[in-house]
Curated annotation (Swiss-Prot):
One of its GO terms (molecular function) is structural constituent of ribosome. Signal peptide: none annotated. Pfam families: Ribosomal_L35p. InterPro entries: Ribosomal_bL35, Ribosomal_bL35-like, Ribosomal_bL35_CS, Ribosomal_bL35_sf. Keywords: Ribonucleoprotein, Ribosomal protein. GO terms for cellular component: cytosolic large ribosomal subunit. This is Large ribosomal subunit protein bL35. It comes from Nitrosospira multiformis (strain ATCC 25196 / NCIMB 11849 / C 71). GO terms for biological process: translation. It comes from the Bacteria. Residues 1-21 are annotated as: Disordered. Gene3D superfamilies: 4.10.410.60. SUPFAM superfamilies: L35p-like.
């Protein structure tokens, strides 16, 4: 059986942590930031976990992660 391929877009967006949770970055932080308040931009900093109902589909896109 051939090797399974990793979806490269998912590999760029997600990181699998040691406990099995998946880390992702926040959206709405790339451009058009002048109309967004300082508070909203500050709250979009950092990373968050992918919701547990979506973890299985993300892990399926990255079989070797």
């Amino acid at each position: 059986m051939p090797k399974m391929k990793t979806k490269s877009g998912a590999a760029k967006r997600f990181t699998v942590r040691a406990g099995g949770t998946v880390k992702r970055s926040q959206a709405f932080k790339r451009h058009i930031l002048t109309k967004k308040t300082t508070k909203s931009k500050r709250q979009l900093r950092g990373s968050v976990n992918v919701h547990f109902s979506d973890v299985a589909s993300v892990r399926a896109m990255m079989p070797y992660a």
